[in-house]
Amino acid sequence: MGLDQWAFRVKNKAVLNRFEYNQDYEHKQFFYWRKNRYVQNWMEKLYQSLGGKDEFNLKILQLLPEDIDKLEEDTKSGKIKEYNKSGFFFGDQPFEYQEYDSIMRFCRMAREEFKRDNAVFYDSWY
């Protein structure tokens, strides 16, 4: 048990809004994290800033290029470490190189999806 997180892509034309897409279109996972609470808490704050009111569990969130830019900026500057809210399912590992590296790889991969005319969504479950 614990926090599982992934990013998936769908065609841009499938997007209905920042929180849903037309499920008649195929989606494909392209990135996975396990218990990266920094990413989860960062995404939850973005979700809330966009009007999300429910618990941020099993909620999808479309990420735009500017969101990826901000995530990368916050990671490079170390601000991501401020999102250190722990939880029973979130683990307690410190922010180390592997967390940094996984976020940077994700940002690169998300940008590749944008170039392919795909939308990027984040999802998580705990």
Predicted ranges, named:
Residues 1-126:
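Acidic (Asp/Glu-rich) sequence patches and key acidic residues
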